[in-house]
């Protein structure tokens, strides 16, 4: 596949999107113990400029991962689409193959990123473009191209 935005051929790009903390995260015993210890360090530190993620856990060595792109906790669905999918869909429209894959642990936001919030898909719900995931946005881009 040729990435129209970066001019690369046949390359797999790795992008991480770090989701915001949810209620369950804060209620975990480890989170409570971490807060009691007085440590204010985040266990997942995001550096979007360097496209890196630093993982910290008490009593373990920190691990840094440098990727092609990193989207922080405040990344919108639109920003995510622009970074992750627009170039792939552009290449597909030019006749190349393209795949977008969401991978990760349960509860990390894959479904939200790909489809949008589950409430968005309930029967009778009003569509809200700003909440749309990658699939809806890709379909819209393809249909706009076809017109």
Describe each PLM feature range.
Residues 40, 49-147:
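P-loop NTPase motor catalytic core
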Residues 1-55, 60:
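Long, basic/Gly/Ser/Thr-rich N-terminal segments
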């Amino acid at each position: 596949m040729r990435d129209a935005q970066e001019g690369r051929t046949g390359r797999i790009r790795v992008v991480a999107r770090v989701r915001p903390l949810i209620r369950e995260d804060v209620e975990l015993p480890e989170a409570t113990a971490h807060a009691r210890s007085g440590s204010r360090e985040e266990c997942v530190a995001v550096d979007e400029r360097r496209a890196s993620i630093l993982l910290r856990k008490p009593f373990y060595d920190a691990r840094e991962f440098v990727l092609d792109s990193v989207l922080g906790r405040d990344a919108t669905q639109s920003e995510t689409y622009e970074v992750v999918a627009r170039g792939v869909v552009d290449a597909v429209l030019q006749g190349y193959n393209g795949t977008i894959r969401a991978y990760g642990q349960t509860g990390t936001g894959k479904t939200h990123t790909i489809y949008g919030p589950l409430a968005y898909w309930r029967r009778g719900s009003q569509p809200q473009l700003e909440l749309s995931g990658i699939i809806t946005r890709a379909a819209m881009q393809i249909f706009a191209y076809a017109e």
